[in-house]
Each structure stands twice: as structure tokens, then as C-alpha cells.
């Protein structure tokens, strides 16, 4: 049979308060780790160092690279250039953009100089 000192109301109250404090601390600690994981980050992928939006290029790649590849051969005859520009009007647009240096929609003598 337990002694009277072990079951006194003061000891029971202390045990109850101690249990409540332990449970409250455990709940606060669990909530803190859970909220730490749910914090919205400005750069969520920075933790993994994964590139974002730097993948393979699709068909949206500009055709100016094709024009540069064409001109990198350094020597293209007029007939070759005409044939290529007739087949690919997008390249013709790129040539016009290159010639129109001030982007006013007109090719002037100042643009050609």
C-alpha cells in the first residue's frame, strides 16, 4: 500500500502539472518542425540546387542562331542565300531585323552605314 506522502493531493497535482507541461512541450516542438517544413520559400528549389527553367530549348529557339550558323561559313553565294531565304521566311525576317538597326520599321541609308 502506498504511503500517504506519495498520494497526497499536492504530489498528485505536481504529477498532473508535470505531465501537462511535458505534453505541451512535445506538441510545441512537433508543431515547430511541421511549420518549419511548410514555410513558403522564395526559391523552393534552391535547397536542391536544381536549375529552374533552364532545360532543353524547344522550338521557341530563335532563328538568329540558324542565320549565324549560315553566315559562319564565311562565303555564301547570292543564289544560295536567295534559295535559303525563299525556303525559310523567318530567316528573311532576321536579315531585315539585322539591317534595320534602329528598329523604326524602315531600312535607311543610316542603317546600312
From Swiss-Prot:
Q: What are the entry keywords? A: Amidation, Calcium, Cleavage on pair of basic residues, Metal-binding, Secreted, Signal
Q: Where does Ca(2+) bind?
A: 100, 102, 104, 106, 111
Q: Which residues carry this modification: Phenylalanine amide?
A: 54
Cellular component per GO, a single term: extracellular region
The residues forming the signal peptide are 1-32
Q: Name one GO molecular function term.
A: calcium ion binding
* Principal cellular location given in the protein's record: secreted
The record's subcellular locations are:
Secreted
Regions that span the bilayer: none
Residue span, EF-hand domain:
87-113
Write out the tissue specificity statement of the associated record.
Seems to be specific to the mechanosensory neurons of the central nervous system.
InterPro entries from the UniProt entry: EF_Hand_1_Ca_BS, EF_hand_dom
* Prodomain positions: 58-113
Role this protein plays? May function as an inhibitory cotransmitter acting in conjunction with the fast excitatory transmitter released by sensory neurons. The peptide selectively inhibits certain postsynaptic cells probably by means of sensorin A release.
Write down what this protein is called: Sensorin-A
Species classification: Eukaryota, Metazoa, Spiralia, Lophotrochozoa, Mollusca
- Supply the gene name: PSC1
Amino acid at each position: 500500500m502506498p504511503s500517504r506522502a506519495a498520494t497526497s493531493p499536492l504530489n498528485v497535482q505536481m504529477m498532473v502539472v508535470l505531465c501537462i507541461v511535458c505534453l505541451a512541450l512535445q506538441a510545441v516542438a512537433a508543431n515547430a518542425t511541421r511549420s518549419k517544413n511548410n514555410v513558403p520559400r522564395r526559391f523552393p528549389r534552391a535547397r536542391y540546387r536544381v536549375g529552374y527553367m533552364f532545360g532543353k530549348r524547344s522550338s521557341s529557339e530563335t532563328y538568329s542562331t540558324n542565320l549565324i550558323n549560315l553566315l559562319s561559313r564565311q562565303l555564301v553565294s547570292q543564289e544560295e542565300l536567295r534559295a535559303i531565304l525563299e525556303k525559310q521566311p523567318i530567316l528573311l525576317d532576321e536579315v531585315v531585323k539585322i539591317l534595320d538597326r534602329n528598329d523604326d520599321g524602315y531600312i535607311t541609308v543610316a542603317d546600312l552605314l
